[in-house]
Amino acid sequence: MLIIIRPSGEIALKSPRSRRNFEHTLANNIRSVIKEGKIWRSQGVLFLEVNDDNKNIEELSKVFGIASFSPVMSIKSYNNNLEDIINKAKEVFAEIVKGKIFSVRAKRIGSHNFTSLDVQRKVGEALYPFSRGVNLENPEVEVFIEIRNDVAYFYHKIIKGPKGLPVGVAGKTVVLFSGGIDSPVATWMMMKRGSIPVILNFNLGGSVHRKFVLEELSVLRKWSGGHKLKLFIVNGTDVLIKLSQIEKRNRVVMLKRVMYKVAERLCDKANAKSITTGESLSQVSSQTMTNLYVTEYGIKYPIFRPLIGFDKEEIVELARKIGTYEYSIKLPEYCAISTKARTSVELDEVLKDEENLNIDYEKVLENSEVIEI
């Protein structure tokens, strides 16, 4: 089976050097997902040749960096002869257009003694007797012929990919992963921009919390382009015991700040250059502008919040698409540790609490459980 893979449009806009790097990473990710076959680059697309019984082909729809792909039939060295293309088109498409209204779409790369319009007209005439008619605007079936120099490719399916950038081209980011609806979506969105997520989870719910986090990451692993996901599970109960020493209204923001501080140490350890969270502006009390400022104050790494402008309905819709929603919805909101959280915490208070608590963030990270998924 031969498959033509079209990279995301934005990859084509890169400089020649960056484009080669992105396409090389995409090819490696595809190899990791498909697990067998031959792949090569040619004139802005990738070709993948695999056994006909390969069951991993549908996984290409979850490989970031792919705009679309199509299983194709091809003929080589047709000597610039349109008649050869017409005959092959009849062989490939006659059953597909049978009894249906159809259209032919053609495009070419290279020098030929015919135009793309010639191909559409001649192939359309040849297929017409098998069909119920032609409609270029609203066909029941579209058939495609793509001529690249001396090779013609025939296909009738264009399967959409997730677009974005190949996972790995943007380096690593440490993701604060609670396991709720938001953090898996934020993780997915950072992978879509080419980042490899390093997952940091503060376990506040014991074995149940751990179980659902692992299930969510198993879903996200299918979108990772073959990259393994490394999970660091911190014992959040010990942190909560510490936080019981400070004023209730400040505890939620302080908990988030502890998470950021541990994430900062993990960035150092994992060679990650950013921290990612599922925070959305003003969604809950800890996510007001003031509290976000206090939470991230003094953190040396950039903090990405890919959901910052999303409302909850939009986030839920994405979670359903990704496949994490069914697990996220079963988890309690473990981070809601105070019913009277303030929407505007004073920075001086938090810094004073932080000094008094004297948490050893390095030790918190050292005592974490590490799992590779």
Curated annotation (Swiss-Prot):
Keywords: ATP-binding, Cytoplasm, Nucleotide-binding, RNA-binding, Thiamine biosynthesis, Transferase, tRNA-binding
Major subcellular location class: cytoplasm
HAMAP family: ThiI
The family this protein is said to belong to: Belongs to the ThiI family.
Enzyme class per UniProt: transferase
Purpose: Catalyzes the ATP-dependent transfer of a sulfur to tRNA to produce 4-thiouridine in position 8 of tRNAs, which functions as a near-UV photosensor. Also catalyzes the transfer of sulfur to the sulfur carrier protein ThiS, forming ThiS-thiocarboxylate. This is a step in the synthesis of thiazole, in the thiamine biosynthesis pathway. The sulfur is donated as persulfide by IscS.
Record-listed ATP binding positions: 176-177, 201-202, 256, 278, 287
A GO term from the CC aspect: cytosol
Pfam families recorded: ThiI, ThiI_fer, THUMP
Domain THUMP: 54-158
Molecular functions (GO terms): ATP binding; CCA tRNA nucleotidyltransferase activity; tRNA binding; tRNA-uracil-4 sulfurtransferase activity
Gene3D superfamilies: 3.30.2130.30, HUPs
Protein name: Probable tRNA sulfurtransferase
Subcellular location(s) of the protein: Cytoplasm
Reactions listed under catalytic activity: [ThiI sulfur-carrier protein]-S-sulfanyl-L-cysteine + a uridine in tRNA + 2 reduced [2Fe-2S]-[ferredoxin] + ATP + H(+) = [ThiI sulfur-carrier protein]-L-cysteine + a 4-thiouridine in tRNA + 2 oxidized [2Fe-2S]-[ferredoxin] + AMP + diphosphate; [ThiS sulfur-carrier protein]-C-terminal Gly-Gly-AMP + S-sulfanyl-L-cysteinyl-[cysteine desulfurase] + AH2 = [ThiS sulfur-carrier protein]-C-terminal-Gly-aminoethanethioate + L-cysteinyl-[cysteine desulfurase] + A + AMP + 2 H(+)
Documented EC number(s): 2.8.1.4
Annotated GO biological process: thiamine biosynthetic process; thiamine diphosphate biosynthetic process; thiazole biosynthetic process; tRNA 4-thiouridine biosynthesis
Organism in which the protein naturally occurs: Saccharolobus islandicus (strain M.14.25 / Kamchatka #1) (Sulfolobus islandicus)
Pathway of action: Cofactor biosynthesis; thiamine diphosphate biosynthesis
